[in-house]
Amino acid sequence: MGQKIHPTGFRLAVSRNWASRWYANNTKFAGMLKEDIEVREFLKKKLKNASVGRVVIERPARNARITIYSSRPGVVIGKKGEDIELLKAELQRRMGVPVHVNIEEIRKPETDAQLIADSITQQLERRIMFRRAMKRAMQNAMRLGAQGIKIMSSGRLNGIEIARTEWYREGRVPLHTLRADIDYGFSEAETTYGIIGVKVWVYKGDHLGRNDAPVVEEPQEDRRRRPGRPEGRRREGEGRPAGNRRGGAGAGRRAAPGADAKSGE
């Protein structure tokens, strides 16, 4: 079901792409996958204040190429590129191969689902009301071009004893449509009452494939055929004056048998 499945995994090879782009045999696959998970966790902690949306890892020919998508690339690079060099050295030590790090800027962070989720969790950790944070994020996303957004928060909201889930939606979020460009993000806020999870879905429009074209509606015929009846035929009695129809308003009752005979006598 589109409501339950992960939106990115549901649309892989249709409108989304993998975050790890490499091939490995059965003996090396598990180790490389674990390495990717550890690298992403390290970058998430290291670049917590750099507004990192996603990390793409590629492994071409005994090398590694890591692309970091951030709305604040200056924080990642640092003064005169010092921070990026230290980050590259640490990644090479962890992965054991030469690493190339690329930084890509996110032009509209207000419509990036992961950055929206991170922003809401940071506000929750600063004791800001969750409804205010969610509605403000939705307004900013719709103002900057998103066609729909849905935000869900789960946990001990506002410190209540029983955990609950609340969500808000604005615009359209068609989760069942494969061609729909749905951006999904998830983040957790560590509060004094416990962990609050935040999920964000952002609908940015539809993707058109290589051979697809916009649908053009053809003008419908004014005269439509009724199902089950040929067009040239009509029912018995149609088109006649009301008084001449059988059983109509002008038709009299049938005479009783023998009435003509009595009248002729």
Curated annotation (Swiss-Prot):
Name the segments for region: Disordered: 211-265
Asked if the record carries the keyword RNA-binding, the reply is yes
Asked if the record carries the keyword Lyase, the reply is: no
PROSITE patterns named among the record's database cross-references: KH_TYPE_2, RIBOSOMAL_S3
InterPro entries in alphabetical order: KH_dom, KH_dom-like_a/b, KH_dom_type_2, KH_sf_prok-type, Ribosomal_S3_C_sf, Ribosomal_uS3_bac-typ, Ribosomal_uS3_C, Ribosomal_uS3_CS
- Spell out the GO cellular component terms annotated for this protein, sorted alphabetically and separated by semicolons: cytosolic small ribosomal subunit
Q: Where is the KH type-2 domain?
A: 39-107
UniProt entry keywords in alphabetical sequence:
Ribonucleoprotein, Ribosomal protein, RNA-binding, rRNA-binding
Q: Where is the composition biased (Basic and acidic residues)?
A: 221-239
Q: Which GO terms describe its biological process?
A: translation
The entry lists its GO molecular-function terms as: mRNA binding; rRNA binding; structural constituent of ribosome
What is the role of the protein in this entry?
A: Binds the lower part of the 30S subunit head. Binds mRNA in the 70S ribosome, positioning it for translation.
Annotated family = Belongs to the universal ribosomal protein uS3 family.
- Extract the HAMAP family matched here: Ribosomal_uS3_B
PANTHER family in the cross-refs: 30S/40S RIBOSOMAL PROTEIN S3 (PTHR11760), SMALL RIBOSOMAL SUBUNIT PROTEIN US3C (PTHR11760:SF19)
Subunit description:
Part of the 30S ribosomal subunit. Forms a tight complex with proteins S10 and S14.
> Know the name of this protein?
Small ribosomal subunit protein uS3
Q: Which organism encodes this protein? A: Cupriavidus metallidurans (strain ATCC 43123 / DSM 2839 / NBRC 102507 / CH34)
